[in-house]
């Protein structure tokens, strides 16, 4: 099985040249590594379910994702290759990088293809979006891991901030100085910030009214900031790349 799988992993995201080999001290969770040199690495393009913190329980498949990444790192003799992102650090100070096993397989694509995480894209670190989407699609079509039971929420089911994949019908599209705002049945509003409009086909966004869409990203509760005006949707989902928004039949 592994030989067949490895050829598939390479097909999703081929190995690049010029990788920096590093030693892994431990796997923090399904998408984060701690290196022996003290750095934390957040894997680009992969978001795995959260481990429980501060009394919260683990999200489904959080432990499975961490254990699988531990096994992949162990199979690579505890050393991996890093390809840093165009943006090399996140706001927590973690190194942002694509991670490769000793055999050249992209570990984000491997996790996605096994249904142990969600494909995500945050500009400008979007070079592998296509192959990572393909890896996730194969898991989704096969009903693997977290796709066994659909994790997609209806827009009106959103009740907490954090990462979500949601679906809904577009009730309104508006463009102003704050960017493009796409409302889903008064429950959630998606936003494309002005600095990201160049990445999107804005004419297509403006035609979305009445269409059924699926979006993913990190939901923000606007009522907590006291900035919620009358008639505004409580939940805001900033779109960080066109791949985070799909039309559905």
Pin down the residues of each PLM region.
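Small beta-barrel nucleic-acid-binding modules, primarily SNase/OB-fold domains
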Residues: 2-249
